[in-house]
Amino acid sequence: MKRVLIKLTGKVQGVGCRRTTLAKARVLGVTGYVTNCVDGSVEVLAQGSHVAVDNLIAWCQAGVPCTVGLRVDVEEYQGDDIYLDFSIVR
C-alpha cells in the first residue's frame, strides 16, 4: 500500500477542489481524506495501491478543475492510519 500527503496551494479553497478531489479519489479506489487548511491550502491524505495513488497524484499535477495557480507538493505519509473510504474532513 502506498500512502502520501498531497498539499495543494494556490486558489484552491472555495472553488470545489475538495468535492472534485473526493469524486476522483473514489473513482480511483483511493482512501483517505481531503481538507481545507488554515493557511489557505488543501491537504489530501491518499492511500491505496501504488497505481491508484500515482494516478491521483498525476490528476492533481495536471490541474485540479477550478483551481488557479495550483502548486502540488507530495510527500510520503509515515502514519499507520488505515482509512476505509475517502471523505471530506471539515
UniProtKB/Swiss-Prot annotation:
EC number(s) given by UniProt: 3.6.1.7
Alphabetized Gene3D superfamilies for the sequence: 3.30.70.100
The keyword Oxidoreductase belongs to this UniProt entry's keyword annotation: no
GO molecular function: acylphosphatase activity
Active site: 18, 36
Keyword Heme carried by entry: no
Principal EC category: hydrolase
Record-annotated disulphide pairs: none
Keywords: Hydrolase
Domain spans labelled Acylphosphatase-like: 3-90
Stated family: Belongs to the acylphosphatase family.
NCBIfam families noted in UniProt: PRK14429.1
The protein's name in its UniProt record: Acylphosphatase
